[in-house]
Amino acid sequence: MYQKSLLFSLLASSALAAQFPIPDSKGSVTFDEPYEIAAGETYDGGYKTYGRGVSCTGQSEGGQDDTVFIVQEGGTLKNAIIGSDQIEGVYCLGACTIENVWWEAVCEDALSLKGGSGPYNIIGGGAQGADDKVIQHNSGGQVNIDGFTVYDFGKLYRSCGNCDEQYARTVTIKNVVANSGKTLVGINSNLGDTASIDSSTCATDVKKICVEYKGNDTGAEPEEISEGPSDACQYSEPLSSC
């Protein structure tokens, strides 16, 4: 009887540990159009849930008009929950800070970096349920991801593999908690991309940690070159389990 009780307790603890730690919502807001955060301004969402009142269209490509928030150069979005009733999540059109922002269910992408040259700072927060990418990096420059939590995902970060204009992009990842994913990071090493993953990051049931692709500007599907630690994918394996 004691052994059965102990087993039940361990299973219950494991289940609780695997729950996505999204904060409790303080209310809900539905926008008729994207909410624009002006250059240099900060929007504090007060941990309310924000959406667009629409159904996710899966991996069908949306656009800027489908976003919940648009952040202009130097803007900050913080303390917000992005609901499941949206298509494109958040766009940064220049350097931005995304702090303690949570996605309850990713649709096409959670966060798209579309303009400027950074830096783009993602601090805290988290996302779950991404069939493909969580953070899509189309512009150039530096991305810093610190303290983000990601569950049930395709890729946490992907440097655009086939954009019309390509750049050498850099991403640093630390204090990230990753659970049940296909790839943590995807970069285009032939274009000069680099990824640095600190040992403070943990990964449980993540198939690939860092994948190098042959990026292009033709729109073709990029070819996977290699995976694992290298000059471009800078980390020590294995990462610890979460």
From Swiss-Prot:
Which InterPro entries does the record cross-reference, listed alphabetically? Pectate_lyase_PlyH/PlyE-like (IPR004898), Pectin_lyas_fold (IPR012334), Pectin_lyase_fold/virulence (IPR011050)
Single Gene Ontology BP term?
pectin catabolic process
Q: What highest taxon heads this organism's lineage?
A: Eukaryota
Could you list the residue ranges forming a coiled coil in this record? Answer: none
Renumbered to this chain, region (Disordered) spans 217-242
For this chain, one GO molecular function annotation is:
pectate lyase activity
| Cofactor binding mode and count | Binds 1 Ca(2+) ion per subunit.
Renumbered to this chain, the signal peptide range is 1-17
What's an example GO cellular component term for this entry?
A: extracellular region
- Residues with glycosylation annotation: N216
Which reaction does this chain catalyze?
A: Eliminative cleavage of (1->4)-alpha-D-galacturonan to give oligosaccharides with 4-deoxy-alpha-D-galact-4-enuronosyl groups at their non-reducing ends
Cofactors needed by this protein, per the record, are:
Ca(2+)
Compartments reported by the entry:
Secreted
Q: Recite the UniProt keywords alphabetically.
A: Calcium, Carbohydrate metabolism, Cell wall biogenesis/degradation, Glycoprotein, Lyase, Polysaccharide degradation, Secreted, Signal
EC number in record: 4.2.2.2
Q: Which family does it belong to?
A: Belongs to the polysaccharide lyase 3 family.
Function per UniProt: Pectinolytic enzyme consist of four classes of enzymes: pectin lyase, polygalacturonase, pectin methylesterase and rhamnogalacturonase. Among pectinolytic enzymes, pectin lyase is the most important in depolymerization of pectin, since it cleaves internal glycosidic bonds of highly methylated pectins. Favors pectate, the anion, over pectin, the methyl ester.
**What is this protein's name?**
Probable pectate lyase D
The species is Aspergillus fumigatus (strain ATCC MYA-4609 / CBS 101355 / FGSC A1100 / Af293)
Q: Which gene encodes it?
A: plyD
